[in-house]
Amino acid sequence: MSYSAYSESKVNPMHVVIMGCGRVGSTLANELQALGHSVAVIDQEREAFRRLGSDFNGKTVTGVGFDRDTLIEAGIEKAEAFAAVSNGDNSNILAARVARETYGVQNVVARIYDPRRAEIYQRLGIPTVATVSWTTDQIMRRLTPQGKASEWRDPSGAVQLCEIFVSRDWYGKPITLIEK
């Protein structure tokens, strides 16, 4: 089920700029539009915009997602959110930093493929989604038997949230007693 299916029907509309019109970018654009947001999508290839479908009524801009003129044409100056979801880690981080540092966009996220870079980018203040790590975690969760399958792991791997099944004897007991 999509994110919009879980969202409230009334939202405060915002302008969102998305760099990259692949499967993720086009799906994100359509989901945001369905929630009532105004959306501009940037891609270097004009053909990529076909993925948006005929119902998309947002703005499409052909260009490089960290180029000043391209960003201005996409409405970055009024944007409340920016998502960099192209197929290049470096381009995504550069575009996200430009959106945040040059144009003051507060809600910024960059997709990255190389999970080893995630911690570095987090230190730069750019929230990232490491698709390879996330996908691996989700597949492992479904493949491994009940137990300590990872539900979520932060990009650095320092924090991991796990779902475990506990005995009825543990109900209502403090964790300190269970650990013994």
Model-derived segments and their meaning:
Residues M1-K180:
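Cytosolic regulatory regions of ion transport systems
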